[in-house]
Amino acid sequence: MARRTPSQLNMLLAVDKPVGCTSHDVVSQCRRALHERRVGHAGTLDPMASGVMVMGVGQATRLLGMLTLDTKSYVADISFGVETNTDDAEGEAVRTVAVASELRDPAYAREQLAAMLGPQMQVPPAFSAISVNGVRAYKSAREGNAVDLPPRPVEVYAADLIAVSGEGDTCVWTVAFSVSKGTYIRALARDLGRACDSAAHISALRRTASGVVSIGACHAVEELSPEFAAGFALDPIAALGATRVDLPGDLADDLLCGRRIPVERALASFDSSKAPFALVLDGGLKALARIEGGRFVMEHVFPQAIGGVR
């Protein structure tokens, strides 16, 4: 079988991950859809979760660790009455508590959610991808081993009640969260249940934003193709939180060779106090640089320009 010709695509994309597949599945699907082996992502989502996944394609995979995606937003369904070993609906019940009537009171729900705001130390779920002595925690947990993960600093910026639903033995709070990177919404649900003298787990989860990338910028994998993907590209400079600097085309060879370039070669004024600097030639991102001694010093050079610059 003949090999596919590489797509030559170099860009960031936002994909709306569906429920039921892993983050690696999404990477594999994008590789097939775009005919491009070099595809990666900027942060995982659990199989039961859906929503924003930021993908790097081609040269843009080098940007994934630099993106300013520190704030995450989610809409979560928190089901009371049962705590599971995974802190979500896919796990086994480890504790069951009768649903108290106060849990159905929106005022009580808002009071409890308000108490969750701010910086805190969070114990991650035992079923997580955190490595312990070189082994993923979820692998140890699946084998029946005790997993003792140390608490980590996280912050909850917002926890807004959308609705209280359910009747009989069920009670569900639908909550919009805004949290720091590394916060486990599953763990928030677990701790919320305990704070309410109850038990709780996540029954549905959707990531609605990752940094500056919102769900409205996302596309289904089925929409992707080499011919049309360029129209879906994210602005890499906005995603990096970088300062744009346009340079004349005659500096292409200097950039490619990593030579220092005088700041005065910039085609327009820019804020020299806000690094990093995204160097743009002919509408494409060619390098990231800092300034030393009145010259741009290259930190990352992209032989194939990264598209999507606006």
Where are these regions (language model features)?
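Catalytic cores of RNA-modifying enzymes
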Residues: M1-S180, I185, R190-A217
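Accessory RNA 3′-end/elbow-binding domains used by RNA modification enzymes
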Residues: M1-P18, H24-H41, L45, A49, ...
